[in-house]
Amino acid sequence: MKNATKSRAVELTVTALDLFAERDFASVTIKDIANACGVNTALIYYYFENKEDLFRATIENAITEALENYTNLRKRHDDPVDLINDWFDTNLELSGSIRKLVKVMLDYSGSRISISSIDSEINNFYDVERSILSDSIRRGIEQGIFHAADPDRLALFVSTHLDGIMVAAMIRKDFNLDTAMADLREILWFHLGFLSDRIQTRHRQDGDTA
């Protein structure tokens, strides 16, 4: 019963995330969420004390899901290049849900709401994201795959620019998310002195036409 209850609560937060991302916390009502879920408001109040409690659970569940994806990434790869490539690919594949999460976190950071558990979850999310990158970069340097670099600084650079890419994709109608992600990946490889197959092919083509 506990699992069924938890599952139902998570389902409500998934719909709530869509609405909070589409609009914002202030303009979304419990009734809006209930209507979108096809339930009455009493059911939502059964699981959550109020809208703020639902908002907290929505962000926390979205971050938990993202962190589970990151955990699975670590488990799949021992090779630092493969892990970084998969990290980029995963963020591209899940860009829709990531944009929703970024939008809601952005709205939260600019609001008057302050919930310590949400702040901790957000900080943990970025800590884990950066650690995947910095640990992989560090291992690559130790193995002689990458040139010497500052792993933490590069990880912060990529993480920060990923947020910028996700925001740009929400604002600019003609924005090409695939190209932006590919460019960010290439910038990282250049900083590390590592030429991926895609970059090598481009350089060979440039040389042939020179």
Predicted regions and their residues:
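Helix-turn-helix
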Residues: E11, L19-D53, A57-T58
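Amphipathic alpha-helical packing segments from all-alpha helical-bundle domains
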Residues: T64-L67, T71-N72, S97-K100, S116-E142, ...
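Generic hydrophobic, amphipathic alpha-helix propensity
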Residues: R8-L17, I33, T58-A62, A66, ...
